[in-house]
Regions:
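Glycine-rich phosphate/diphosphate-binding loops that line cofactor/substrate pockets in enzymes
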Residues: 19-34, 52-57, 85
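Short glycine-rich or small-residue beta-strand-to-loop segments that form or flank ligand, phosphate
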Residues: 33-38, 62-65, 91-94, 135, ...
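Glycine/threonine-rich beta-strand-loop-alpha-helix active-site module
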Residues: 74-176
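C-terminal catalytic subdomain
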Residues: 258-265
Length: 265
């Protein structure tokens, strides 16, 4: 049996990792970004922690903040229009799964305009081109969308959830900075942490699991058990936040390659 394992080209992890952003953009020879985030993260200042780094480096960007929880086909289409209007050559995704999924949809459609209707991306769409470069900075420790090959978009016209699986959508770079997670409320910290735990358990027992994915998932389960209570009760504690940030990341690396179970459909 042949097993496939797809990862980001480059990942950075650790407190303050967002400060690597100018180096990343220069290495990839990028010149302007569309920052994909949501109004909530703009309001609480989490997105600003990233855009401040861009400002200090003199890197140009526009912001697309119309992202909603459970992003829709309309969100993606609006984002594609915003990307084209901005003259950007990359996307910086800041947020949880909704921001990441929207960014993936935008990046894939821009690179593969024959899928401009978005709905034809459902399932394993035969896209030919890699997404425009996405640099993903998660603000939750749950979905692991910064390293997965799948994303979920709501088709509002047909009232259905579209699961899209495409190796071409994986972000070029993941920057996992636990400091971006400190403002996450207790309830969301717990909920996203349980999502990460579910990913790890499902990824361990799925039929596609193998020795390499098992190493990731078992370690993720152990780290979540140790660190989620700390992150919930002491949101400013770097031990809990860093532990959860890494646990959800390695859980996603594995499940993205071996699949999940009935809990995630």
């Amino acid at each position: 049996m042949i097993n496939r394992f797809i990862l980001n080209e480059v990942s950075y992890f650790g407190a303050g990792a967002r400060k690597q952003l100018p180096e990343v953009l220069a290495r990839l020879n990028l010149h302007k970004a569309l920052v994909a985030t949501d109004k909530g993260l703009l309001k609480v200042g989490t997105a600003k922690m990233v855009t401040d780094v861009l400002d200090e480096a003199g890197f140009a960007y526009d912001i697309y903040s119309e992202i909603k929880p459970n992003p829709t086909v309309t969100n993606v289409k609006q984002g594609v229009d915003a990307f084209k209007a901005s003259g950007a050559d990359c996307i910086i995704a800041i947020g949880g799964g909704s921001s990441m999924d929207t960014a993936k949809g935008i990046g894939i459609v821009v690179a593969n305009p024959e899928f401009a209707d978005v709905v034809s991306l459902e399932g394993c769409a035969p896209t030919k081109n890699k997404s425009v470069p996405i640099i993903a900075l998660p603000t939750t420790a749950g979905t692991g969308a910064e390293v997965t090959i799948n994303y979920v978009i709501i088709d509002e016209e047909n009232q259905k959830k579209m699961v899209c699986v495409d190796p071409n959508d994986i972000p070029a770079v993941a920057i996992v900075d636990p400091e971006l997670m400190y403002s996450l409320p207790k309830g969301l910290t717990a909920a996203t942490g349980m999502d990460a735990l579910t990913h790890a358990i499902e990824g361990y027992i799925t039929k596609g699991a193998w020795v390499m994915s098992d190493m990731y998932e078992l370690q993720a389960i152990k780290m979540i058990a140790e660190n989620l209570p700390i992150a919930v009760e002491e949101p400013q504690n770097p031990v809990g936040r860093e532990g959860m940030a890494l646990a959800q990341y390695i859980a996603a690396q594995a499940f993205s390659n071996v699949g999940l179970g009935l809990v995630h459909g």
